[in-house]
Amino acid sequence: MLALIQRVTRAAVTVDDQIVGQIGPGLLALIGVEPGDSDAQIRRLAERLLSYRVFGDDAGKMNRSLTDTGGGLLLVSQFTLAADTSSGNRPGFSTAAPPLEAEPAFNQLVAICREKHRGGVEAGRFGAHMVVDLVNDGPVTFLLRP
């Protein structure tokens, strides 16, 4: 499992012209599920999403986490994130978990984050064509693995 996280001033995800999730200041996390991702890896990624220090402290140093700031978290499933791009001119998706494996893993990640984060956790709709609107703050973007 991997997450491309972006510090945002706001973000929203829309499906069929309806906003299904939106946050103010916080993190947008695009989530790729890989075959065999374990419960332990999912829990570890949730922990990292909530505790990774990418927000400035009083001195402007990246020293505060989402938990510290109480910011929002918007989780969006994105199987293309787990694509094999090592050769050729077209991505391969054998390195991404199939939907029957990926959807429960993504939903588990959402549930864990909602249980542990009081700042609000929103999510896109798994498997849907989504439009993601965001304002990246910084820009600050990191690729996280459990």
From Swiss-Prot:
Reaction catalysed by this enzyme: glycyl-tRNA(Ala) + H2O = tRNA(Ala) + glycine + H(+); a D-aminoacyl-tRNA + H2O = a tRNA + a D-alpha-amino acid + H(+)
One Pfam family in the UniProt entry: Tyr_Deacylase
Keywords for this protein: Cytoplasm, Hydrolase, RNA-binding, tRNA-binding
GO CC, one annotated term: cytoplasm
Localization per record: Cytoplasm
Motif Gly-cisPro motif, important for rejection of L-amino acids: positions: 138-139
Enzyme Commission number(s) from the entry: 3.1.1.96
UniProt keyword Repeat present: no
Predominant place of localization: cytoplasm
Organism superkingdom: Bacteria
One GO biological process term: D-amino acid catabolic process
Family label: Belongs to the DTD family.
Functional summary from the UniProt entry: An aminoacyl-tRNA editing enzyme that deacylates mischarged D-aminoacyl-tRNAs. Also deacylates mischarged glycyl-tRNA(Ala), protecting cells against glycine mischarging by AlaRS. Acts via tRNA-based rather than protein-based catalysis; rejects L-amino acids rather than detecting D-amino acids in the active site. By recycling D-aminoacyl-tRNA to D-amino acids and free tRNA molecules, this enzyme counteracts the toxicity associated with the formation of D-aminoacyl-tRNA entities in vivo and helps enforce protein L-homochirality.
Subunit architecture: Homodimer.
Comment on protein domains: A Gly-cisPro motif from one monomer fits into the active site of the other monomer to allow specific chiral rejection of L-amino acids.
Protein name as catalogued: D-aminoacyl-tRNA deacylase
Natural source organism: Xanthomonas euvesicatoria pv. vesicatoria (strain 85-10) (Xanthomonas campestris pv. vesicatoria)
Gene that encodes the chain: dtd
